Amino acid sequence: MTILIGNAPCSWGVEFAKDERNPAWTTVLDECAEAGYRGIELGPVGFMPEDPDVLGPALESRNLALIGGVVFRAFHDPEKWEDTLDGSVRTCKALKAHGAKHLVLIDSISDRRAPTAGRPEEAEQMDDAEWAGFVERIRTIARMGTEE
């Protein structure tokens, strides 16, 4: 059995696409390839170029493949659905354009849950309506990921 190990821009401290502290996306690709990796995750949508005609050749010239992407958005918050949907659509488009097979959905940190992080017995729980909305938003993006 062969195990393939890739990397991700978060290894370079990239958590948000427009953070001025981020290294250049080309630096991330260069150093990832130099370290011997052959696969990389997309990082936050907007960090790497969204134009496949720019990112594709950059990956290919370094013998790298885009292997997946993460949507880190406020799935718990119906007021932020448009932002969540936008980030999800853009991520799925990039994954499809480059043949990546892995889509990871992560609910962002909330002011409500942060104070009890790591202590589930103390955490305030979603009510039935909140839970149903959360699940439906996740399902919507999961379907998009399988259909794109």
Q: How should each PLM-predicted stretch be described?
A:
Residues 1-102, 123-147:
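N-terminal pre-domain/capping segments
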Residues 59, 106-111:
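Short glycine-enriched loops at secondary-structure junctions
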Residues 117-123:
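Intrinsically disordered, low-complexity Ser/Thr- and acidic-rich flexible linkers and loops
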